[in-house]
Amino acid sequence: MGYPTPIKLGLSAPINVPLIYKTGEKMRYVAYKIYPEEFLNNEVVDNALIIEGRKVRRVRILGKVENINVGNIISFYVDGVNVRYFEEKPVYIEEGDIVDVIGRPRTYDGEKYIMAEIIRKRDERWIKLRDLEIKKTRKYLLERAELYEEENEEMSLEEEVYTEILNSDVIKDKILAIIENVGEITYEELAEKINIPEEDLEKYLSELKESGDIFEPRPGVYKVL
């Protein structure tokens, strides 16, 4: 049964999105785009989804919302994947919505789920686009995600930083999070908040506009769709 009105999940809160976290803080891993069935068909070990011998610590899935449950924990399913939302930033969703979810693989009482960080509503056109994106970016997952071994040691800080800087997806995620957090931002303000060369910032902004993630309500001003 669908919901007649959107459900509000949580209250607003700032998002901290530096390119590299300060010493002692946890690294923010790349959010790799995967199919929902890949989450369902693979193991979660040590808070990482194991795909083709790689440990994926942040995932991004697209699918249809069902079985929304609002209680002590807010949860719903996206094409069969259990998603749980603990953030305070408000999110409005209904049964049947197409949503784009970024989050971390977790398990509780033997059940796999995604601890959602960002949830965005999309439309049907995104399903075909996401299929193309996954095929295009899968090589990065296979080349750069952490290797899974039974007794694998943690990657060094230098390796984690190298992996994060190499992958443009994580930088675009940070740009999106900054814009989403402030609501509307000028190019100059954004350039101050994210420490990358201007030519790279212009390229990423152009790609985000082409993909429909952001738009310019006025020249040089950006908002999330």
UniProtKB/Swiss-Prot annotation:
**Gene3D superfamilies, A to Z:** Nucleic acid-binding proteins, Winged helix-like DNA-binding domain superfamily/Winged helix DNA-binding domain
InterPro entries reported for this sequence: NA-bd_OB-fold (IPR012340), PCI_dom (IPR000717), WH-like_DNA-bd_sf (IPR036388), WH_DNA-bd_sf (IPR036390)
Q: What region holds the PCI domain?
A: 166-214
Pfam families in UniProt: PCI
Q: What is this protein called?
A: Uncharacterized protein MJ1654
Q: Name the source organism.
A: Methanocaldococcus jannaschii (strain ATCC 43067 / DSM 2661 / JAL-1 / JCM 10045 / NBRC 100440) (Methanococcus jannaschii)
Lineage here is: Archaea, Methanobacteriati, Methanobacteriota, Methanomada group, Methanococci
